[in-house]
UniProtKB/Swiss-Prot annotation:
Enzyme Commission identifier(s): 2.3.1.234
Protein function: Required for the formation of a threonylcarbamoyl group on adenosine at position 37 (t(6)A37) in tRNAs that read codons beginning with adenine. Is involved in the transfer of the threonylcarbamoyl moiety of threonylcarbamoyl-AMP (TC-AMP) to the N6 group of A37, together with TsaE and TsaB. TsaD likely plays a direct catalytic role in this reaction.
SUPFAM superfamilies per the UniProt record, alphabetical: Actin-like ATPase domain
GO annotations of cellular component type: cytoplasm
Binding site for substrate: 134-138, 167, 180, 279
Main location: cytoplasm
Family per record: Belongs to the KAE1 / TsaD family.
Binding annotation for Fe cation: 111, 115, 319
Keywords of this entry: Acyltransferase, Cytoplasm, Iron, Metal-binding, Transferase, tRNA processing
Protein name: tRNA N6-adenosine threonylcarbamoyltransferase
Record's catalysed reaction(s): L-threonylcarbamoyladenylate + adenosine(37) in tRNA = N(6)-L-threonylcarbamoyladenosine(37) in tRNA + AMP + H(+)
Length: 354
């Protein structure tokens, strides 16, 4: 069964072909990053128009890569939401029109579910059940995943998502758009503990997270540096140090909350998905993760247990059509009914969890 996947929720146009017998056959992606850089952020109208221009050429490119034709497509999956309304509508219109013309089913996919399942595209795949950390510009959530369609939301950010905090902090530091990736790059040259920022909610008993206060702490540090130097410019090394301290704080919070989720569920496998999943520091920290079951005072400590951690291939951390094609194929196999034309710019993840 060959499924065409279409992703158009924000500023990447992704098209891919996934074969339920042979795996991923083709994957094409166009990013609008350069177009939006001039404006310092995504312009929804420009994003929508660019999706319209790119969808047909990308589809034909995928078919050529796979040595397939339109007639070989068995189903069309598309991102129904959440995302930018106009951008979603561009993908939905194309997917539904193509499916109608081919007389094939169309499968709506929740964008976050696509990210959630993207590590299953890797050669080394996790087994169910696992704890999933969805960490991107729009969402930071921890979930218990027991199978396709069997998800339980355990905790999430109560304010800014981690990726959003990266981007806003980068803008505060005067870094060019898109700033999150640049901040991570500069953090590599930062000195450890030159700055120390708070780890919001790291010791709370629940799995909720908060990053807006961390952003405020960075602003306070930046204003202090500028006042001491009597200039708006921040010395290069100081800026790098701030980037490192910020990144370390975010990763520490994410790691602490995921460890708590592992202890709560009893799972020993973690899947990290979403754009921030490409962050080197996060991958390094999670790659060395262990958990230790708490013991009563005076009792011998339990030995640390190694955790198996899985990341999607770097190409599938950001928005892409491959994850949508795969998620659509999985739902088609499990009997999900074909969907409708409508899009859902605001689609709470709670509506797809059990």
């Amino acid at each position: 069964m060959l499924v065409l996947g279409i992703e158009s929720s924000c500023d990447e146009t992704g098209v891919a072909l996934y074969d339920t017998e042979r795996g991923l056959r083709a994957h094409c992606l166009h990013t609008q990053m350069a177009m939006h850089a001039e404006y310092g952020g995504v312009v929804p109208e420009l994003a929508s128009r660019d999706h319209i221009r790119r969808l047909v050429p990308l589809t034909e490119g995928c078919l050529a890569q796979a040595g397939a034709s339109y007639g070989d497509i068995d189903a069309v999956a598309f991102t129904q939401g959440p995302g930018l309304g106009g951008a979603l509508l561009a993908g939905s219109s194309y997917a539904n029109a193509l499916a109608f013309a081919l007389d094939k089913p169309v499968i709506p996919v929740h964008h976050l579910e696509g990210h959630l399942l993207s590590p299953l595209l890797a050669e080394e795949k996790p087994d169910f059940p696992f704890v999933a950390l969805l960490v991107s510009g729009g969402h930071t959530q921890i979930m218990a995943v027991r199978g396709i369609g069997d998800y339980a939301l355990l905790g999430e950010s109560v304010d800014d998502a981690a990726g959003e905090a990266f981007d806003k902090t980068a803008k505060l530091l005067g870094l060019p758009y898109p700033g999150g990736a640049k901040l991570s790059e500069l953090a590599e040259s930062g000195r450890p503990e030159a700055f120390v920022f708070p780890r919001p909610m790291i010791h709370s008993d629940d799995l909720q997270m908060s990053f807006s206060g961390l952003k405020t702490a960075v602003l306070t540090a930046v204003e202090k540096v500028r006042a001491e130097n009597g200039a708006d410019d921040i010395p290069e090394q100081t800026r790098n140090d701030i980037c490192r301290a910020f990144q370390d704080a975010v990763v520490d919070v994410l790691a602490a909350k995921v460890k708590k989720a592992l202890l709560q569920t009893g799972f020993r496998t973690v899947v990290v998905a979403g754009g921030v999943g490409a962050n080197r520091k996060l991958r390094e920290t999670f790659g060395n993760m262990t958990v230790q079951i708490p013991t009563p005072k005076g009792k011998p400590k339990h030995p640390s247990e190694k955790v198996s951690v899985f990341f999607p291939p770097t190409a599938y951390c950001t928005d892409n059509g491959a994850m949508i094609a795969f998620a659509g194929a999985m739902h088609l196999k499990t009997g999900r009914e074909a969907g409708a034309f409508n899009v859902r710019p605001r689609w709470p993840l709670s509506e797809i969890v059990k």
